[in-house]
């Protein structure tokens, strides 16, 4: 049995793995102790072929294991991580994003730490988004905590909620601070969410300015669904307030993030002559169309055309929705993923 497993989920991120995977293996080349587990989450960009052509020698050595699932249509962060963690054989499991470089000696450092200490989990200092998701813990602790919460959809908060749940279970958070463990591939934010449901199904985004801190967001999806709500920028509102020194507490609190003010409503929309109708459960809203705007007597929604701004809005909205879900939860692991987690069909090392 391996001592530590580095767990990588990948959906159409071939160009990142081509840069990071082999280097991470060579920088942590402990064949008897280490395994890298790649879960190909139904990629369509040639990942399977590249692994077969360029990485087979590492599979034959036993330091690399390749799994593929053909079921997902969209990338689901919590579900994919739960799958790959369950497939890992190491006593310690570590989430590793496809764009991360581990750094030379990361595996050896973690093995020493987990051999000398009990009931801990390791994270980054949580100051850098690109390394935020890296977490190492004993596999048994992951299973007992019931994994990442699969109620979260889209970008953000699945790792924060998981870390907080580990703390509530009595585990101690440790932080790796070595700068060589923080190197990443830089890339556009769109690549973080390009394979996720919300961005793929999005048809258009409209903004209704309220004040410097609040904006009403209307998102129209393909298939006639919509979402609408007020996003409040607490980061700007609390700009002059002192920061929370504990980064995890800062992430859990609403003082330093975008939040939904009130509730996020969803429903079905349909086109009308010169406008659209938003159908809620017990009401409807009619918006007229004029010069890339939708309006009624009280609101004027401007259509967002800039692709980069759309990505920023999608990331902010999904994180705010997930935060709203998290605030309604308790930290009882029994209520997390009650019907199981990380479920699905996979194929190991091309054994179809």
PLM regions and their residue ranges:
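Short, well-formed alpha-helical segments that are part of the catalytic scaffolds
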Residues: 13-28
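Short beta-strand/loop segment that forms part of the nucleotide-sugar
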Residues: 32-45, 67-70
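A conserved acidic beta->alpha catalytic loop
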Residues: 38-51, 97-101
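Acidic donor-binding/catalytic loop of UDP-sugar-dependent glycosyltransferases
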Residues: 46, 100-113
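Glycine-rich, basic loop-to-helix element that forms the pyrophosphate-binding segment
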Residues: 71-88
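Short aromatic/hydrophobic "clamp" motif used to bind/position activated sugar donors
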Residues: 93
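Conserved donor NDP-sugar-binding/catalytic core segment of glycosyltransferases
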Residues: 108-134
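C-terminal catalytic/acceptor-binding lobe
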Residues: 167-352
